[in-house]
Amino acid sequence: MSKKETKKNRPLFTEFTLDMFSRSSGRSHSEIKQFNQWRDEIIEADKYTFETPHLTPQTPEISVRRIHGDEHQLVNFSSYNYLGYANHPEVIQAAKDALDTFGLGATGSPVLNGTFDIHKKLEDALTNFYGQKGYGVSLFSSGYGANVGVVSSYIHKGDYVVLDHSSHASLIDGAVMSQGTVKLFRHNDAEFLEKILKRISKENRRILVCVEGVYSTDGDYGNLKDLVAVSKKYGASILVDEAHSLLIAGKTGKGAVEEFDVLSEVDLVIGTFSKSFGGVGGCVYAKKELINYMNYYARSRMFSCALDPAVTGGILKALELAAGPDGDQKRKRIIENADYLRSLLKDKVNIGTSQSWVIPVIFGDERKSLPLGDHLMRLGFDFSIMMFPAVKKNQSIIRAFVTSEHTKEQLDGCAEALIQASKEFNFNI
């Protein structure tokens, strides 16, 4: 059999990748048909691990049902329930109490009739948590919506948004929606950023530099000290997205802005409730006059329903716990767990520049993604397999989220599974 014939008979999922279906074919809709054919072949080969329904809460050990009906007991490294608050009994009870008091949904825009007393309590609690006079908080129904709404309402046509090359999709989408001019700088490179700012600052336009506290695929900290200093030097405003660092980084959990002592110099801090808080939603912390403005001009807030009251009640309790001794203990434990897992993996697999509880294992070739995800699940572990467009082309990763709730035995098993897979799929060091 010729090489051409062999390739022709291979399953589509070993040859095609997601980017091949992202271009319009016009009225034929052929990319949609081809995508579904690609997906169907993955399912038929029993390699499909995406969208797998969970039968249990997001704890370190979970039960899932795969698409053909078989159930698996897995050690969970794919959830960002970093501090375990999604399942904490006090958080659950607080959510139940809010459900009984306020009902299931807010059923209205926060600007019109969707704001409840419990929303104001959460805004006040978050403002007090950060502790700066003259500041406030605005709530959003998702972290994605917070970034999109904040960036697109702060920046207008003729202004500039300057993004790190590793920026989350929500920051990119907010920048595009703003109609401002978008500039990109090399990841965490303050000198590269300075070259951009030096040139564009002469135009006397508003400039917003967007960075992250901890990067969601690389797992490294944002170079906040240097990036903030350069931004301020050229009169740029700076936004820090703390989605993966709020409640964890910093002595009291205020995030990377506390870890690197730049809170007072940052203009906008974005928080996400779906990770360390264990709920869903997002927020922005900024000067009160800016919060008042964004409440009306952030379209993702104005034209979305307000946060569910029950979820808001749970988030409020999670914040209370995280700001006290419980949070101190969990922060210590998650950092110890992450350090331990990195120590087991380094020199065995490529974990890039990870410094946090987000640990990527880089395997590169995205054609390995689907068989690799299936292989790891059959070993008894659930990871996030990330390929383009979530990461750069041919930079696919297995992403492990470490939590405060993982045991040493689970971390040992995680390292063993990843190292075994790296040999099986030929991406070991």
Protein language model annotation of sequence segments:
Residues 81, 183, 187-240:
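Active-site phosphate-binding strand-loop segment of PLP-dependent enzymes
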Residues 92-141:
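Conserved N-terminal alpha-helix of the aminotransferase class I/II PLP-enzyme fold
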Residues 18, 330-339, 348-379, 390, ...:
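Conserved PLP-binding catalytic core of the aspartate aminotransferase-like
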Residues 2-11, 89, 93-97, 101, ...:
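PLP-dependent enzyme catalytic core of the Aspartate aminotransferase-like
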Residues 2-22, 26, 31-104, 236:
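N-terminal "arm"/small-domain region of PLP-dependent enzymes with the aminotransferase-like
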Residues 150-169:
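Conserved PLP-anchoring active-site segment centered on the Schiff-base-forming lysine
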Residues 252, 258-293:
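Active-site PLP attachment segment
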Residues 276-343, 349-352:
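PLP-dependent aminotransferase class I/II
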